[in-house]
Swiss-Prot record:
It is found in: Cell membrane. Its main location: membrane. It catalyses: citrate(in) + 3 H(+)(in) = citrate(out) + 3 H(+)(out); (S)-malate(in) + 2 H(+)(in) = (S)-malate(out) + 2 H(+)(out). This is Citrate/malate-proton symporter. Signal peptide: none annotated. The gene is cimH. Changing residue 402 to S: Retains 55% of specific activity for citrate transport. Retains 52% of specific activity for citrate transport. The keyword Transferase does not apply. NCBIfam families: ccs. It holds the Pfam family 2HCT. One of its GO terms (biological process) is citrate metabolic process. Belongs to the 2-hydroxycarboxylate transporter (2-HCT) (TC 2.A.24) family.
Length: 450
């Protein structure tokens, strides 16, 4: 009897606890800037201010998380609050390019810039994000969809790239930029796969073949990459808006029309599995391990680490090498990164990897029109080719947009603007494989005919 009374008392206490009135502080905790409760946001502001005043902003993981979360979600929230801007990927644009501008104009404390840059460069933070998103997205797909989508996606990518190159060359030449300049310093760089795997090998190759220094070539190549990426981000945001008005054109992250329900739960024995912390951790370790294998592939064979990781994840999915429970855990990791890490990462990218002066250097009318013609053509061809192949046209257009982005950093920004980070595996194919083919063919042909 005593045990029954105790049990009933506990139930009563629980009910009272559930219906208790919230005080003003608890209510304030429900107001958020991004995912940060307002009181915590205010505390972070005070802490960061104190650290800056004492020149004590460290580049360790704890301080870096606080700094990047504070600024990343601040700029994203501003982007979400501006009516027109939020419709064209405003949160991603502001979280990336405003930090770049404030660094260039020395409006951000140097201690913040230094700590963020050191953490980003030394921690491989970007590739941890890509590993979590790519592996989780692939393991969350249906096997049949995975095969169909990867087989089909090369068609709009190839057709879009060739058509965009032709249109870009025609537009640039007509605007007086010259055939050679348009091809080598505008069209090819846009599709080269970013800075590390595009601009740098291109500029080295140009300097070996033509009478130009590597530094001069790099300075000519980089602005087109930056502006091309910005155009792709804005257009991806517009496509997201169009998709909300024309739902029949989009799979909301699914690529092939044969894909039906949420892929991550296709073989789940229980909806609770995704939230099992042990499985979540297993999925995260799997993603990290696959990326490390990719790094070895790069060291021994020169194969891009993200592509090797992607191929391994595809093989694991195709041959069912891990149980469905761990697949769901990996999918949970990708959801965590897309929800909590995207905007802090974009802030870090803006501070440490996006030179504002190079972006501004491309801002003349002829360059803008030519670059825009390349990106628009690539996305438009992706849209209509995808539709013809019975794929979701908005998704195929967004994947094609990643071929005109800033490499891995551009993929994150473009897919964030489009609100489709689950397309990261296809974006990596578009960026890494498409970029490598573009650079290799360009230098091979240039060597033969220059």
């Amino acid at each position: 009897m005593g045990e029954l009374q105790t049990h009933m008392q506990l139930q009563t206490d629980t009910i009272h606890e559930g219906v208790r009135k919230e005080n003003w502080f608890a209510k304030a905790m429900n107001i958020k800037v991004g995912i940060i409760p307002l009181p915590v946001y205010a505390l972070l502001f005070i802490l960061i201010t104190v650290f800056v005043m004492h020149h004590d902003v460290k580049s360790d993981i704890l301080t870096s998380i606080a700094v990047m979360a504070f600024f990343g979600f601040t700029f994203a929230q501003i982007g979400k609050s501006i009516p027109i801007v939020r419709s064209i990927g405003g949160p991603a644009i502001l979280a990336t390019f405003i930090p770049s501008a404030v660094v260039y104009y020395h409006l951000l404390p140097n201690d913040i810039v230094k700590s963020t840059t050191e953490f980003t460069e030394n921690s491989n933070f970007l590739y941890l994000f890509i590993a979590g998103i790519v592996v989780g997205s692939i393991l969350g797909m249906k096997r049949e969809t995975l095969v169909k989508a990867f087989m089909k996606i090369f068609i709009p990518l190839i057709v879009g790239s060739v058509t965009a190159a032709i249109v870009g060359l025609a537009v640039g030449t007509l605007l007086g930029l010259g055939f050679q300049h348009t091809l080598l310093y505008i069209v090819i760089p846009i599709m080269a796969g970013g800075v590390g795997e595009g601009a740098i090998p291109l500029s080295i190759g140009y300097s070996d073949i033509m009478p130009i220094s590597q530094g001069e070539a790099f300075a000519l190549v980089l602005p087109s990459i930056m502006l091309g990426s910005l155009c792709a981000i804005i257009l991806a945001g517009l496509l997201n808006r169009i998709g909300k008005k024309k739902p029949e054109w989009t799979g909301n992250g699914k690529v092939d029309r044969s894909e039906e329900e949420s892929p991550a739960l296709e073989e789940s024995q229980s909806g609770q599995q995704m939230f099992n912390l042990s499985l979540f951790a297993s999925g995260g370790i799997l993603a990290v391990s696959l990326y490390l294998v990719g790094m070895l592939a790069h060291d021994f064979f020169g194969f891009p680490a993200p592509v090797a990781m992607l191929l391994l994840a595809v093989l694991i999915k195709l041959f069912r090498l891990v149980p469905a429970s761990i697949e769901n855990g990996a999918f949970g990791v990708s959801r965590f990164f897309s929800t909590a890490v995207t905007y802090p990462l974009l802030f870090a990218i803006g501070v440490s990897m996006t030179p504002w002066d190079k972006l501004v250097a491309a801002f003349n009318l002829s360059n803008i029109i030519t670059i825009l013609s390349v990106v628009v053509t690539m996305m438009a061809v992706g849209f209509f080719t995808g539709k013809w192949l019975n794929m979701y046209p908005i998704e195929t257009a967004i994947i094609n947009a990643c071929h005109s982005g800033q490499g891995g950093t551009g993929d994150v920004a473009i897919l964030s603007a489009a609100e489709r980070l689950e397309l990261m595996p296809f974006a990596q194919v578009s960026t890494r494989i498409g970029g490598a083919i573009t650079v290799s063919l360009t230098l091979l042909l240039l060597h033969q005919f220059y």
